[in-house]
Amino acid sequence: MTAPVPAPRILLPLLLLLLLTPPPGARGEVCMASRGLSLFPESCPDFCCGTCDDQYCCSDVLKKFVWSEERCAVPEASVPASVEPVEQLGSALRFRPGYNDPMSGFGATLAVGLTIFVLSVVTIIICFTCSCCCLYKTCRRPRPVVTTTTSTTVVHAPYPQPPSVPPSYPGPSYQGYHTMPPQPGMPAAPYPMQYPPPYPAQPMGPPAYHETLAGGAAAPYPASQPPYNPAYMDAPKAAL
């Protein structure tokens, strides 16, 4: 029996896979560095071309160079003694004190100084606003109040008394006499506390006539006298 012929549906994907397969070297190759120029290998996207001493990247398949230890073996005598291993060279570059940039040290010092200055200013501001800080208590301490004693002398002045009115006496008052009001600023005249004794009563008539006083020649005065009439008395003269 003959083998079955594969269907065209299976052949078409196989042809596509063969056509889409990348050419050799498309995934990239690692070229060994040239002697004396670089100590690290170089990755190329296409191929490595050149010789053992000088390799470079290229895309020409005809110039492709395949490196191998047997082909590019280097005798030990040709290796210079001054070349240091990669590990030692890296450690020397890493920890060598002269390799550091001087500007980096200046920047670090400047950053530390600015940080200390900002922290000092913030601390002072917090101390002046917080009641538990010593600077706040020192600035807010109450100042001693100096009290001055002033002595006040009180002078007891006599209370001004109203002018006293002289007491009126019994009997008829004199029409021509007018009481003078007290002058302002002048003390009133003191008056006795006791009233003066009353005037004796005026007799109803003149005294009786005695013959002994008139000498015997005088005529006898009638015993009966008319009653006393004040209208017959002279009117008092007004005081000037």
From Swiss-Prot:
Residues 127-240 are cytoplasmic. It holds the Pfam family Shisa_N. Induction: Induced in a p53/TP53-dependent manner in response to cellular stress. The chain crosses the membrane at residues 106-126. Residues 1-28 form the signal peptide. It comes from the Eukaryota. It is a single-pass type I membrane protein. InterPro entries: Shisa, Shisa_N. One of its GO terms (cellular component) is endoplasmic reticulum lumen. It is found in: Endoplasmic reticulum membrane; Nucleus membrane. Residues 29-105 are extracellular. One of its GO terms (biological process) is positive regulation of canonical NF-kappaB signal transduction. GO terms for molecular function: WW domain binding. Interacts with PDCD6; PDCD6 can stabilize SHISA5. PANTHER family: PROTEIN SHISA-5, SHISA. The proline-rich region is required for endoplasmic reticulum localization. Belongs to the shisa family. This is Protein shisa-5. The lineage of its organism: Eukaryota, Metazoa, Chordata, Craniata, Vertebrata. The gene is SHISA5.
